[in-house]
Curated annotation (Swiss-Prot):
Its main location: nucleus. The modification Phosphoserine is found at S1007, S1011. One of its GO terms (cellular component) is nucleoplasm. Signal peptide: none annotated. The keyword Transport does not apply. It is found in: Nucleus, Nucleoplasm; Cytoplasm, Cytosol; Cell projection, Lamellipodium. Protein phosphatase 6 (PP6) holoenzyme is proposed to be a heterotrimeric complex formed by the catalytic subunit, a SAPS domain-containing subunit (PP6R) and an ankyrin repeat-domain containing regulatory subunit (ARS). Interacts with PPP6C, PPP6R1 and PPP6R3. Interacts with PPP1C and HNRPK. InterPro entries: Ankyrin_rpt (IPR002110), Ankyrin_rpt-contain_sf (IPR036770). ANK repeats lie at residues 40-69, 73-102, 106-135, 139-168, 172-201, 205-234, 238-267, 271-301, 305-334, 338-367, 371-400, 404-433, 437-466, 470-500, 504-534, 549-578, 582-611, 616-645, 652-681, 685-714, 718-747, 755-784, 787-817, 822-851, 855-885, 889-918, 925-954. Keywords: ANK repeat, Cell projection, Cytoplasm, Nucleus, Phosphoprotein, Repeat, Ubl conjugation. This is Serine/threonine-protein phosphatase 6 regulatory ankyrin repeat subunit A. The keyword Transcription regulation does not apply.
Length: 1053
């Protein structure tokens, strides 16, 4: 809030603050602006209301002052008057229709302000004008909340008497009693309780009023609530009881009261902490701790992470409390889950007095903690020299390593405190001792850029060229982390060898380049020329073989965008076109990552622009175009020779323009087009940049291509134009632009691809309704052209009902009975795939339900053969499909359902059959449905057939009855026939005898060799549907692989 000087305000405002109505009247008469606003939008009326001057308020309003004017905080004059507890001012404002429901930016009404400021008389004037006294502010608090928080008993009584909801809660679910308890307003708490407030209510975090009172130390409220019998051990959402909360906040009087009333002193919260843990840690918890310990609190109780109260004192440096806990029987060397004792914790946080106390009490200074470290490790790592000194005085082997082989000197070197390091060195620490990774303290000092420690270690005789397990020297680590070069320079001056390579073949130059440390590179170059370092493998490496890395420092600097480091490198390294294992140059990597400065540096130094990598045969121009780095692209093209570099092709024939369009980089597309890129260049699949834009749907890129004359009807190797691809992918914006372009060239966009499919086929097949609608608006697509597997076939086979309906509405109902090259209608397609909605649509437009294809199959047969039960049910029930029809192999729909084991479909058909002749109808192999169902083990179908009079004695072309047809092969069938003949001897004239002997007559004629033919199996004609999900030959599967733009067509039928 800005404080303004009164003398700088208008005369009218000054007169108001002087309380002079006559002067105000005179100024108003002189046409002073009564609605003037200061820089916080406060008007003179706000000032009068703030002062509570009713006469001046009246005068201003009558002179045209806006009674509901809002300042920058949305406060009205009524808010101001109420805040000043001026009843007269409020009455005047209300008389002139001041808005009692006006809200400020905190959504507080004048009633909220009155409740907070104990303006009872003002509230009495406001309440009768309000429809609801329970309106809440932005925090969800009602006027009752504010009154309770402020401790205004009279206001609370008034609000309750006028219908205030005593249990209303704010956005944290806190009620008025929570706030009154927290603030210690005992009379208000009693008043609320007497009016039915819940004393055990909980907020969102399950804090009760007792928690609230305990946290703020309001003992009178605590006692009152305890007298009412509330549960003193009730946990909140974190498991903290009121005793926990009181200890955490250091409210010793409340703690004493709770303990006296029987609170559980060892109650654990969700993390396993007891009140004693909180008392040990909190700022003002000393007296609380004394009370807890004196009342039986367990000093060795552990939290879930294994910490005892003694750990907590060590963590927060509570020296006197640690003594109390130790005297009460605490275990000195108890471990937490990381294995750390209180001594470890105290050492880690540098609490010297606590360390003294713990050691005096017998703490083991040689006890291992996390990762096997001693307390001395932690003190040295954190740089607490006084703590180190105390721990050293206890006496133990200073070079004892932790679990990773690191000594205390390693820790001190990593921590960077010179005093700790010197203390350890003077005590005799071994500065050449290595950890399990082969690193000495000098490695750690270099890695952390601790110059003073590094200086001390080298001065003590530490080897500067020692290798760790990765083959790295301290110089490698300094090159990685040293931004100002001090550590690296000192190592170089002390004979560190910059040519030594690690096991990956990297030396200090590589590391400096990778992290962009220009100063380090300059320092190394001043010692040894960089090109010399790159040619040598190091010096005294154990292996004689050259272990140089395939990645050069130039690659590393370029890839990470360190152009300043790159500037140093290009001055010394002559081969700027050095390649990595995949054949990429530093310029390629810089262009790929979009590092313009690096690209500029390399080009200016003569790096080759048109060099191709080994794998994709791409140049840096391709790399920049792929990732949309337009600035890099302009630099590369502008400096490339010859000029046709803009259309350079990669291994797949792709130009930079194609890659830019493919990835939707409009800026790059325009840059390339402006440089003369061939807009119709083709790759090895015959696809142009426009084909790619059609597939990816990048409209801006497509527009740019069309503006530069791209041909929209160029065909790829499969005969597909960009119009085909945009329709197949559903990119309506791109399709519209292409159709418009075709129209402007007076070209026919309805051309078919190599398999006869038009864009309409593709759009229908993939269900892109908006594209279908757009294409059908073109007169040329309203003609039946292309593959006989029509767009309607394509739509229904993939259940694209919307597209199918558009086709029928636009092209007429006659298309529902169109046939493909194998005589199949759209109804066949819908039946094959069980798309009921499409089936219903076709039937509603008089599709011929009994039409047959070239194999004699009806849609019902197609559905029955493929087990499409929903379609079968619809066709036999709603569409009354003919059940007596037979295909070219004399199979009925019932035969086909049974032959494929589709029991449900067979039962649905059987349900509609009443003709016994149809039940016993035979196919070309003389098999009845009973033969086929029995052979396939369809028990329920067999039972139904028998119930409908199916003949059990009918014989097929092999002389087998349905019973014998159950045999898995002919040999078993003939054996079964022999057994049946022996079991049931009957006269030769009986039907059973003749049937049996027909089956076994080959056994009774000894002059012939027994030879059984295989039982004919129900099989489809070669032209049957194999997979109606594809369109092959004339019905090629409509499919586009957007990513590869190189799809394959599989035969369907």
């Amino acid at each position: 809030m800005a404080f303004l000087k009164l003398r700088d305000q208008p005369s009218l405002v000054q007169a108001i603050f002087n309380g002079d109505p006559d002067e105000v009247r005179a100024l108003i008469f002189k046409k002073e602006d009564v609605n003037f606003q200061d820089n916080e939008k406060r008007t003179p009326l706000h000032a009068a209301a703030y002062l509570g001057d009713a006469e001046i308020i009246e005068l201003l309003i009558l002179s045209g002052a806006r009674v509901n004017a809002k300042d920058s905080k949305w406060l009205t004059p009524l808010h101001r008057a109420v805040a000043s507890c001026s009843e007269e001012a409020v009455q005047v404002l209300l008389k002139h229709s001041a808005d009692v429901n006006a809200r400020d930016k905190n959504w507080q009404t004048p009633l909220h302000i009155a409740a907070a400021n104990k303006a009872v008389k003002c509230a009495e004037a406001l309440v009768p004008l309000l429809s609801n006294v329970n309106v809440s502010d932005r925090a969800g608090r009602t006027a009752l909340h504010h009154a309770a928080f402020s401790g205004h008993g009279e206001m609370v009584k008034l609000l309750l008497s006028r219908g205030a909801n005593i249990n209303a809660f704010d956005k944290k679910d806190r009620r008025a009693i929570h706030w009154a308890a927290y603030m210690g307003h005992i009379e208000v708490v009693k008043l609320l309780v007497s009016h039915g407030a819940e004393v055990t209510c909980k907020d969102k975090k399950s804090y009760t009023p007792l928690h609230a009172a305990a946290s703020s130390g309001m003992i009178s409220v605590v006692k009152y609530l305890l007298d009412l019998g509330v549960d003193m051990n009730e946990p909140n959402a974190y498991g903290n009881t009121p005793l926990h909360v009181a200890c955490y906040n250091g409210q010793d009087v409340v703690v004493n009261e709770l303990i006296d009333c029987g609170a559980i002193v060892n109650q654990k919260n969700e993390k396993g902490f007891t009140p004693l843990h909180f008392a040990a840690a909190s700022t003002h918890g000393a007296l609380c701790l004394e009370l807890l310990v004196g009342n039986g609190a367990d000093v060795n109780m552990k939290s879930k992470d294994g910490k005892t109260p003694l750990h907590m004192t060590a963590l927060h440096g509570r020296f006197s409390r640690s003594q109390t806990i130790i005297q009460s029987g605490a275990v000195i060397d108890c471990e937490d889950k990381n294995g750390n004792t209180p001594l470890h914790i105290a050492a880690r946080y540098g609490h010297e007095l606590l360390i003294n106390t713990l050691i005096t009490s017998g703490a083991d200074t040689a006890k291992r903690g996390i990762h096997g470290m001693f307390p001395l490790h932690l003190a040295a790592l954190s740089g607490f020299s006084d703590c180190c000194r105390k721990l050293l005085s206890s006496g133990f082997d200073i070079d004892t390593p932790d679990d990773f082989g690191r000594t205390c000197l390693h820790a001190a070197a990593a921590g960077g405190n010179l005093e700790c390091l010197n203390l350890l060195l003077n005590t005799g620490a071994d500065f050449n001792k290595k950890d399990k990774f082969g690193r000495s303290p000098l490695h750690y000092a270099a890695a952390n850029c601790n110059y003073q420690c590094l200086f001390a270690l080298v001065g003590s005789g530490a080897s500067v060229n020692d290798l760790d397990e990765r083959g790295c020297t301290p110089l490698h680590y300094a090159a990685t982390s040293d931004t100002d070069g001090k550590c690296l320079e000192y190592l170089l001056r002390n004979d560190a060898n910059p040519g030594i390579r690690d096991k990956q073949g990297y030396n200090a130059v590589h590391y400096s380049a990778a992290y962009g440390h220009r100063l380090c590179l300059q320092l190394i170059a001043s010692e040894t020329p960089l090109d010399v370092l790159m040619e040598t493998s190091g010096t005294d490496m154990l292996s004689d073989s050259d272990n140089r890395a395939t990645i050069s420092p130039l690659h590393l600097a370029a890839y990470h965008g360190h152009h300043q480091a790159l500037e140093v490198l290009v001055q010394s390294l002559l081969d700027l076109d050095v390649r990595n294992s995949s054949g990429r140059t530093p310029l390629d990597l810089a262009a790929f990552k979009g590092h313009v400065e690096c690209v500029d540096v390399l080009i200016n130094q003569g790096a080759s622009i048109l060099v191709k990598d080994y794998i994709l045969k791409r140049t840096p121009i391709h790399a920049a175009a792929t990732n949309g780095h337009s600035e890099c692209l302009r630099l590369l093209i502008g400096n490339a020779e010859p000029q046709n570099a803009v259309d350079i092709q990669d291994g797949n024939g792709q130009t930079p323009l194609m890659l830019s369009v493919l990835n939707g980089h409009t800026d790059c597309v325009y840059s390339l087009l402006n440089k003369g890129a061939n807009v119709d260049a083709k790759d090895k699949w015959g696809r142009t940049a426009l084909h790619r834009g059609a597939v990816t749907g990048h409209e801006e890129c497509v527009d740019a291509l069309l503006q530069h004359g791209a041909k929209c009807l160029l065909r790829d190797s499969r005969g597909r134009t960009p119009i085909h691809l945009s329709a197949a992918c559903g990119h309506i914006g791109v399709l519209g632009a292409l159709l418009q372009s075709a129209a402007s060239m007076d070209a026919n966009p309805a051309t078919a691809d190599n398999h006869g499919y038009t864009a309409l086929h593709w759009a229908c097949y993939n269900g892109h309704e908006t594209c279908v609608e757009l294409l059908l608006e073109q007169e040329v697509f309203q003609k039946t052209e292309g593959n006989a597997f029509s767009p309607l076939h394509c739509a229904v086979i993939n259940d694209n009902e919307g597209a199918a309906e558009m086709l029928i509405d636009t092209l007429g109902a006659s298309i529902v009975n169109a046939t493909d090259s194998k005589g199949r209608t759209p109804l066949h397609a819908a039946a094959f795939t069980d798309h009921v909605e499409c089936l219903q649509l076709l039937l509603s437009h008089n599709a011929q339900v009994n039409s047959v294809d070239s194999t004699g199959k009806t849609p019902l047969m197609m559905a029955a053969e493929n087990g499409q039960t929903n379609t079968v049910e619809m066709l036999v029930s709603s569409a009354s499909a003919e059940l007596t029809l037979q295909d070219n192999s004399k199979n009925t729909a019932l035969h086909l359902a049974c032959s494929k084991g589709h029991e449900t479909s067979a039962l649905l058909i059987l349900e509609k059959i009443t003709d016994r002749n149809l039940i016993n109808a035979t196919n070309a192999a003389l098999q009845t449905p009973l033969h086929v169902a029995a052979r396939n083990g369809l028990t329920m179908v067999v039972q139904e057939l028998l119930g409908k009079g199916a003949s059990v004695l009918a014989v097929d072309e092999n002389g087998y009855t349905p019973a014998l047809a159950c045999a898995p092969n002919k040999d078993v069938a003939d054996c079964l026939a022999l057994i049946l003949a022996t079991m049931m001897p009957v006269s030769s004239s009986s039907p059973l005898s003749s049937l049996t002997f027909n089956a076994i007559n080959r056994y009774t004629n000894t002059s012939k060799t027994v030879s059984f033919e295989a039982l004919p199996i129900m099989r489809n004609e070669p032209s049957s549907y194999c997979s109606f999900n594809n369109i092959g030959g004339e019905q090629e599967y409509l499919y586009t692989d957007v990513d590869e733009l190189n799809d394959s067509d599989s035969e369907t039928y």
